[in-house]
Amino acid sequence: MSSLLPPLGAVLPELLLALSAVVLVLIGAIQGEKSANLVNGLAIAALVAAGVLVMLQPAVTIAGFNGSMLVDPFARFMKVVALLGAAVSLIMSVDWLNRAQQAKFEYAVLVVLASLGICILISAGDLIALYLGLELMSLSLYVVAAINRDSVRSTEAGLKYFVLGALSSGMLLYGASLIYGFTGTVNFAGIAKVATAPTTGLVFGIVFLFAGLCFKVSAVPFHMWTPDVYEGAPTPVTAFFATAPKVAAMAVFVRVAVEALPHVTHSWQQIVTFVSIASMALGAFAAIGQRNIKRLLAYSSIGHMGFALVGLAAGTEQGVTGVLLYMAIYVVMTLGSFTCVLAMRRDGRSVETIEDLAGLARTKPLMALALAALMFSLAGIPPLAGFVAKYYVFLAAIQAGLYGLAVIGVVASVVGAYYYLRVVKIMYFDEPAEAFDGMPGELKAVLAVSGLFTTFFFLAPTPLIAAAGAAARALF
């Protein structure tokens, strides 16, 4: 069903987020800094409401604005996951903003605007909508990275992200212009009809477009910004960076590859396979020497994007199902891990080295138990959620005949398990360090839910797997 103006229900989540951003700016402008907590609460409510509206949308494909915006089961699944990541990262930031004297109403507004960009990006049906959504998301993220103006690290993180982000946006735009030049259309469905053979110009366009998207998912070789920005940005901001924007970028990566370029699969499959192998290898080996837990999680996220891309490299419906399942489980594991990093405070000051977790099992046994479950899950140890996610992407690769890619993925998982297990060893077997400060209630709730989800997901995986399968079918 295609039309110039889509039914109101199809764009209601985006309209709600846009309206919320305007209202929140007005509240902040009228009430000043004292409105920060109110604006934060309303922003969380807006993100949750947008997620509920997405879930209430009918399970049909709607193409609005002459195909520029697609609302289908795939977009709905990824929007729910991304909005969940955005809402939870805002919940995690409430206590930090007050403790760090960073209670600025602009923070929540920027997260809402970034979430609007994320929703537009996930629903993009042509290259122009893709670029507009990407820039709305990116411009908000550049400011959020440097939100703590009193911190040199935060300012440096924002500047690095801005400079490299601008470069990647330029590459993406150049790739999009090449694809348009060689196909005569920007619409994904139109590109699919015209791009039936891998001409040189088209392949160059795909390379540049994918390079820009690789930057957004922090895949090798466009990962350089990730460790520095993750370490330098405030922890709640890092939690947001590591979840919602990556879900959006991975969604558009999958949509462009599968929907716009189905007849040149072999060309983009080689690119995705190389990026996947390089990301898994770097994520596994570079994290081994890390002492800062945020840098460790940064390299870990690079590796996990490599694992997710294994499913896309397969180029099949099963592969895309694996990608969707992987991203959903990755978001929960990552939010839980960064909750623990946020809770690492002594005498009101944040500590970030792995050694600071020494003996945590004796000083904070429940926090240690939850973090151990998350680390085992990130390592892909059965029967935890992380294992289920890896199983599905590797199975898709094997079914598609990519045996080498699956073997490299398993080896990278084994190597990567070392640094996750080292964290568990330090928590349970080293002499206790000084105890951390008490954990705020909202962090306890996030940690409990993420820990329980990763531990007991294997008992009832069917609903999420079925939802991911239905979403993947919409693209084929």
From Swiss-Prot:
Role according to the record: NDH-1 shuttles electrons from NADH, via FMN and iron-sulfur (Fe-S) centers, to quinones in the respiratory chain. The immediate electron acceptor for the enzyme in this species is believed to be ubiquinone. Couples the redox reaction to proton translocation (for every two electrons transferred, four hydrogen ions are translocated across the cytoplasmic membrane), and thus conserves the redox energy in a proton gradient.
Coiled coil: none
Name by which UniProt lists this protein: NADH-quinone oxidoreductase subunit N
PANTHER family: NADH DEHYDROGENASE
Topology term for the membrane: Multi-pass membrane protein
Family: Belongs to the complex I subunit 2 family.
GO CC aspect terms: plasma membrane
Reactions accelerated catalytically: a quinone + NADH + 5 H(+)(in) = a quinol + NAD(+) + 4 H(+)(out)
Example GO BP: ATP synthesis coupled electron transport
TM region(s), chain numbering: 10-30, 42-62, 77-97, 108-128, 129-149, 162-182, 202-222, 234-254, 268-288, 296-316, 323-343, 368-388, 392-412, 445-465
Keyword terms: Cell inner membrane, Cell membrane, Membrane, NAD, Quinone, Translocase, Transmembrane, Transmembrane helix, Transport, Ubiquinone
Organism whose genome encodes this protein: Azorhizobium caulinodans (strain ATCC 43989 / DSM 5975 / JCM 20966 / LMG 6465 / NBRC 14845 / NCIMB 13405 / ORS 571)
